[in-house]
Amino acid sequence: MSYTLGQLAAKVQGVVKGDADLVIDKLGSLENATSKELSFLANSKYQSLLGTTSAGAVLVKTDELAQLVDNAIVVSNPYLAFAQISHLFVPTTHSWSGIHQSAVVSPKATIAENVVVGPNAVIDDDVLIAEDCVIGAGSVLSRGVKIGKGSRIYSNVTLYHDVEVGEACIIHSGTVIGADGFGFAPNDGFWEKIDQLGSVIIGNNVEIGANSTIDRGAIENTQIGNGVKIDNQVQIAHNVVIGDNTAIAGCVGIAGSVKIGASCTISGGAGIAGHLSIVDHTHITGMTMITKSIDEAGSYSSGMGMEPTGKWRRTAARIRRIDEMAKQISSLGQQIKKLSDKG
């Protein structure tokens, strides 16, 4: 896959500074790109690398920055332009076409044109796969699953019965969608299983990382909105609703019946307790524990950041004494007030 600099500039509505006929074969970082590769500068703290990079061309924001390299594409948002151009250089991820002979496909399944089904995949009864989809090797689409146009299911993904995936979605390997939610009723010292009768409904243009899990609803469906991006090893429990264009980083755990608004970001390792609501445009920093609903947009954090071990131990020791210290401060305040009253 090769493109001229002029072709790439047209793709992102950019302006070429330099040789528009320069052929670009790959994308690369400013540190390691070669003369046939395109890089980008999105953060000014890396501007010094423009003087040392071997990249054939660089995506930059201003004409002034373009003057620091031999060839450039000037765009308003270099990082976004880099993302858009990256789609042109995606390699083919499978070496077969059509339905592989080792795949197990039910005669009751409906598979549209231009669908690829990999080796040892299983397509159960009443599955509906729209056109231009790719189902990777070893993936299992259980009874009644629906996959929208242009979606890609990588190898060894499991979709339980009646799960629905929208158009242009990407689901990475090892992900399990539609397993039973964690529902049990206490019964005289034992646990009675609550069968999970809902499903999981995933919107359009959703990406789900490797080894993530999304549980089916107990009665109502678990719902993932359009444009949602979910990183690796994320757990989403039953009946959760996630609004459009929310992004969730790795190792986040979301307990049952949580409702998360649109355009939120949840950073890595955060935990959200069950039955809470979070409004649109809320941003949760890494390792934060959410224990109550958030009804005002903004950035929220909890916990303590890293310190040298000795300092952290002293801080922890003081935290253990916080009740005692509060009483001492209150007592001192009362003594000061008495002295002031005597005046």
Swiss-Prot record:
GO cellular component: membrane
Function: Catalyzes the N-acylation of UDP-3-O-acylglucosamine using 3-hydroxyacyl-ACP as the acyl donor. Is involved in the biosynthesis of lipid A, a phosphorylated glycolipid that anchors the lipopolysaccharide to the outer membrane of the cell.
Top-level EC class: transferase
Active-site residues from the entry: 238
InterPro entries in alphabetical order: Hexapep, Hexapep_transf_CS, LpxD, Trimer_LpxA-like_sf, UDP_GlcNAc_AcTrfase_non-rep
GO molecular function, one term: N-acyltransferase activity
Keywords for this protein: Acyltransferase, Lipid A biosynthesis, Lipid biosynthesis, Lipid metabolism, Repeat, Transferase
SUPFAM superfamilies: Trimeric LpxA-like enzymes
Self-association and partners: Homotrimer.
Pfam families documented for this protein: Hexapep, LpxD
One example of a Gene Ontology biological process annotation: lipid A biosynthetic process
Annotated catalysed reactions: a UDP-3-O-[(3R)-3-hydroxyacyl]-alpha-D-glucosamine + a (3R)-hydroxyacyl-[ACP] = a UDP-2-N,3-O-bis[(3R)-3-hydroxyacyl]-alpha-D-glucosamine + holo-[ACP] + H(+)
Enzyme Commission number(s) of this protein: 2.3.1.191
Protein name, as recorded: UDP-3-O-acylglucosamine N-acyltransferase
Homology family: Belongs to the transferase hexapeptide repeat family. LpxD subfamily.
PANTHER family assigned: UDP-3-O-ACYLGLUCOSAMINE N-ACYLTRANSFERASE, UDP-3-O-ACYLGLUCOSAMINE N-ACYLTRANSFERASE 1, MITOCHONDRIAL-RELATED
Pathway(s) it belongs to: Bacterial outer membrane biogenesis; LPS lipid A biosynthesis
